Amino acid sequence: MKDLKSLIVDVPDFPKPGIVFKDLTPVIQDAEAFNLAIDLMAEVARRYSPERVAAIESRGFIFGAALARELRTGFSLIRKKGKLPRQTLTVLAPNEYAVEHFEAHLDSIQPGEKVVLVDDLIATGSSAVSAIELVKKLGGRPVAFMALVELSFLDGVKKIAEAYSEVPVFALVKF
């Protein structure tokens, strides 16, 4: 079995000085590793009987779409403001780089639908908190949040738990 953590590459000073970027593309490029990641996410997600996967732009789409396919669920996009063509609901989405907004189409999640949220990486937890808020405002029931990587030194999982203690959080790799 592939060691997912060993494939992730540190890129210093990207996207700006002082940041050490975790490059996940080697996991995506390696068929065995990528399939392992999706299989492990699916194993966890199945515990919650999701009816939909919603993923955060943009690298979250890679894992979210593959997970939705594996789970045979619908897939919803959570995008930055102004990227979706139809009527949307918007929430504030501050992150470690800037203050942004997340949007989803109003019809992307049905009332009461059980939703697993996916992103590539959990850093400060701000994106996850905003995405969960958006799903709830759309009428969905967030049942889990998952990512390939957690940067545990940034306490993102703690921030998510403080905001939404009812939503379990999972990451396959922790730094």
Predicted regions and their residues:
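PRPP-associated nucleotide enzymes
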Residues: 1-175
